[in-house]
């Protein structure tokens, strides 16, 4: 009833092949070679990575071992240097005990030779400063400029000073000073001979001193002795400060010029811990003030700088009869100006003031600058003019 389906015949050459019926033939040789090559590269890469990782582990262990070895070597090296620099106490050799070593240990400040004699007729104690040996070098050049300050405690106002000897550690002084003291009072006095290194532009440094209680000295006959210098104690009095000024004298014009340069480390006078300092300059003749000058006031400072010049007419025949007195005062607008300290220079000044004056006269027409330590106004005493 229904027509039969047509019987399929052979495919026509124009009919496209069916992809589902593609036959699986043998794999080509080039494909096999590619697969083998890629697989080999993968295996080689894996092996190489494992090898590198293993090498890194070994290198790390070796570095740690080397570091430990180097650390031990450094410790050993340090110990060897310690042994060389700081040997055992038992290996130290005893220091030589010759005369030179004793001098270095005991006389490192130096020695002073002096003489003592008492004149019963005049009631005077004669103190001779003879010489010093092996003084300590306080200057950069390995030397000192020594001088000796002499006074009888408890009175420090009456004191003498020798001349300065330049660049020497073994000065010969040969100077004698007289103290008028009743014999019955000598037992309670102490003679002080202090050696200083002179410095024109700063505070003089103490090298050492000798203290002789007069109660221990037999003055029935002249005494001459060597004593070792001892370290000088610090000044008991309060520091007032220092002032620097220059002196210049022109003999042909009879003109004396004082230049107040600066001051430093002044005593605090105001409530706020500062001062308002200025300087008064007096020219004295016969102990009387004949001329007066003063600097400007510097506000709120303990280290004022002035650089102010003042001139005085002083004939040549009067230059040895005058003195110059400089007083540093604290200005007070509401109250009285209070003196901080004072310095005197001149032929009758003595000590540093006399040296400064002598240097000025020895160098005419040249300004000679020098630092001076301020002293309490009531302790600045001028000796009678020559």
Swiss-Prot record:
<keyword id="KW-1133">Transmembrane helix</keyword>
<feature type="binding site">
    <location>
        <position position="197"/>
    </location>
    <ligand>
        <name>Ca(2+) 1</name>
    </ligand>
</feature>
<dbReference type="GO" id="GO:0005546">
    <property type="term" value="F:phosphatidylinositol-4,5-bisphosphate binding"/>
</dbReference>
<feature type="binding site">
    <location>
        <position position="270"/>
    </location>
    <ligand>
        <name>Ca(2+) 4</name>
    </ligand>
</feature>
<keyword id="KW-0812">Transmembrane</keyword>
<dbReference type="GO" id="GO:0055038">
    <property type="term" value="C:recycling endosome membrane"/>
</dbReference>
<dbReference type="InterPro" id="IPR035892">
    <property type="entry name" value="C2_domain_sf"/>
</dbReference>
<feature type="transmembrane region" description="Helical">
    <location>
        <begin position="25"/>
        <end position="45"/>
    </location>
</feature>
<feature type="binding site">
    <location>
        <position position="199"/>
    </location>
    <ligand>
        <name>Ca(2+) 2</name>
    </ligand>
</feature>
<feature type="binding site">
    <location>
        <position position="199"/>
    </location>
    <ligand>
        <name>Ca(2+) 1</name>
    </ligand>
</feature>
<feature type="binding site">
    <location>
        <position position="202"/>
    </location>
    <ligand>
        <name>Ca(2+) 3</name>
    </ligand>
</feature>
<keyword id="KW-0472">Membrane</keyword>
<dbReference type="InterPro" id="IPR000008">
    <property type="entry name" value="C2_dom"/>
</dbReference>
<dbReference type="GO" id="GO:0005509">
    <property type="term" value="F:calcium ion binding"/>
</dbReference>
<dbReference type="GO" id="GO:0031045">
    <property type="term" value="C:dense core granule"/>
</dbReference>
<dbReference type="InterPro" id="IPR001565">
    <property type="entry name" value="Synaptotagmin"/>
</dbReference>
<dbReference type="GO" id="GO:0000149">
    <property type="term" value="F:SNARE binding"/>
</dbReference>
<feature type="domain" description="C2 2">
    <location>
        <begin position="239"/>
        <end position="372"/>
    </location>
</feature>
<dbReference type="GO" id="GO:0043025">
    <property type="term" value="C:neuronal cell body"/>
</dbReference>
<feature type="binding site">
    <location>
        <position position="139"/>
    </location>
    <ligand>
        <name>Ca(2+) 2</name>
    </ligand>
</feature>
<dbReference type="GO" id="GO:0030424">
    <property type="term" value="C:axon"/>
</dbReference>
<feature type="binding site">
    <location>
        <position position="276"/>
    </location>
    <ligand>
        <name>Ca(2+) 4</name>
    </ligand>
</feature>
<dbReference type="GO" id="GO:0001786">
    <property type="term" value="F:phosphatidylserine binding"/>
</dbReference>
<dbReference type="GO" id="GO:0005886">
    <property type="term" value="C:plasma membrane"/>
</dbReference>
<comment type="function">
    <text>May be involved in Ca(2+)-dependent exocytosis of secretory vesicles through Ca(2+) and phospholipid binding to the C2 domain or may serve as Ca(2+) sensors in the process of vesicular trafficking and exocytosis. Regulates the Ca(2+)-dependent secretion of norepinephrine in PC12 cells. Required for export from the endocytic recycling compartment to the cell surface.</text>
</comment>
<feature type="binding site">
    <location>
        <position position="138"/>
    </location>
    <ligand>
        <name>Ca(2+) 2</name>
    </ligand>
</feature>
<dbReference type="GO" id="GO:2000300">
    <property type="term" value="P:regulation of synaptic vesicle exocytosis"/>
</dbReference>
<dbReference type="GO" id="GO:0070382">
    <property type="term" value="C:exocytic vesicle"/>
</dbReference>
<dbReference type="GO" id="GO:1990769">
    <property type="term" value="C:proximal neuron projection"/>
</dbReference>
<dbReference type="GO" id="GO:0030276">
    <property type="term" value="F:clathrin binding"/>
</dbReference>
<feature type="binding site">
    <location>
        <position position="205"/>
    </location>
    <ligand>
        <name>Ca(2+) 2</name>
    </ligand>
</feature>
<feature type="binding site">
    <location>
        <position position="199"/>
    </location>
    <ligand>
        <name>Ca(2+) 3</name>
    </ligand>
</feature>
<dbReference type="GO" id="GO:0007268">
    <property type="term" value="P:chemical synaptic transmission"/>
</dbReference>
<keyword id="KW-0967">Endosome</keyword>
<keyword id="KW-0770">Synapse</keyword>
<keyword id="KW-0479">Metal-binding</keyword>
<comment type="subunit">
    <text>Homodimer. Interacts with both alpha- and beta-tubulin.</text>
</comment>
<feature type="region of interest" description="Disordered">
    <location>
        <begin position="1"/>
        <end position="23"/>
    </location>
</feature>
<dbReference type="GO" id="GO:0016192">
    <property type="term" value="P:vesicle-mediated transport"/>
</dbReference>
<dbReference type="GO" id="GO:0099502">
    <property type="term" value="P:calcium-dependent activation of synaptic vesicle fusion"/>
</dbReference>
<dbReference type="GO" id="GO:0030672">
    <property type="term" value="C:synaptic vesicle membrane"/>
</dbReference>
<protein>
    <recommendedName>
        <fullName>Synaptotagmin-5</fullName>
    </recommendedName>
</protein>
């Amino acid at each position: 009833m229904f027509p039969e389906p047509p019987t399929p015949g052979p495919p026509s050459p124009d009919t496209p092949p069916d992809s589902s019926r593609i036959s699986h033939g043998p794999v080509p040789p080039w494909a096999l070679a590619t697969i083998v090559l890629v697989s080999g590269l993968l295996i080689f890469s894996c092996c190489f990575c494992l090898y590198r990782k293993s090498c890194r582990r070994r290198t790390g262990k070796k570095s740690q071992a080397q570091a430990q070895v180097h650390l031990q070597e450094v410790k050993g090296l340090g110990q060897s240097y310690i042994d060389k620099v700081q040997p055992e106490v038992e290996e130290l050799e005893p220091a030589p005990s010759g005369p030179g070593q004793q001098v270095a240990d005991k006389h490192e400040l130096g020695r002073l030779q002096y003489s003592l004699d008492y004149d019963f007729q005049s009631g005077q104690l004669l103190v001779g400063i003879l010489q010093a040996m092996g003084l300590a070098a306080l200057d950069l050049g390995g030397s000192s400029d020594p001088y000796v300050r002499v006074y009888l405690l408890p009175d420090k106002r009456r004191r003498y000073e020798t001349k300065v000897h330049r660049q020497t550690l073994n000065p010969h002084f040969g100077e004698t000073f007289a103290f008028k003291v009743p014999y019955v009072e000598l037992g309670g006095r102490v003679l002080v001979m202090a050696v200083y290194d002179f410095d024109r532009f700063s505070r003089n440094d103490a090298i050492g001193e000798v203290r002789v209680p007069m109660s221990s000295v037999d003055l029935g006959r002249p005494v001459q002795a060597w004593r070792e210098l001892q370290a000088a104690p610090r000044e008991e009095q309060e520091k007032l400060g220092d002032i620097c000024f220059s002196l210049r004298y022109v003999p042909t014009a009879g003109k004396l010029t004082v230049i107040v340069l600066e001051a430093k480390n002044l005593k605090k006078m105001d409530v706020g811990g500062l001062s308002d300092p200025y300087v008064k300059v007096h020219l004295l003749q016969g102990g009387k003030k004949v001329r007066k000058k003063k600097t400007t006031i510097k506000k709120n400072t303990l280290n004022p700088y002035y650089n102010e010049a003042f001139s005085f007419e002083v004939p040549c025949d009067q230059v040895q009869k005058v003195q110059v007195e400089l007083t540093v005062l604290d200005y007070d607008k509401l109250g009285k100006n209070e003196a901080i300290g004072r310095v005197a220079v001149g032929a009758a000044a003595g000590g540093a003031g006399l040296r400064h004056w002598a240097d000025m006269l020895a160098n005419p027409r040249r300004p000679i600058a020098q630092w001076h330590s301020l002293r309490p106004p009531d302790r600045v005493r001028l000796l009678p003019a020559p």
